[in-house]
Amino acid sequence: MIRIILVLLFIFKISASYSHSQLSEILPKDNVTYVKVPSQINMKFNSLVKLVKIIMIRVDKKEKINLDLTSLNDRAKEHTLPMPKLSSGKYRIEWRALSPDGHIIKGKSDFEVK
């Protein structure tokens, strides 16, 4: 009986760990150097998420870059923002999102503009 309970708990733990939302794609891509900057910031997730924070930093000058957040959806699998005009330099996008199960997920993408 205890073995059955342990097996069920193990299966439940595995299925719960796979249910969290994940970022499946981000543009600009992490660790990429661009000669031509993408026209937008695009984030794709495997489930509906609410983007609760997104910032862009020019890493080499320690400057925060203003982003136009008006196009953000409340909950969506894909979030798109217009890309601000960027000069040559190293940049980072940091983001946080709320998944349907209430967990906060976060990440970053570092890229360079030549």
Regions picked out by a protein language model, each given a short descriptive name:
Residues 1-6:
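Positively charged n-region of N-terminal signal peptides that target proteins for export
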Residues 14-16:
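N-terminal signal peptide c-region/cleavage motif recognized by signal peptidases
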Residues 18-37:
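N-terminal edge beta-strand
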Residues 34-36, 42-112:
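Acidic, low-complexity Ser/Thr/Gly/Pro-rich repeat segments typical of extracellular/periplasmic
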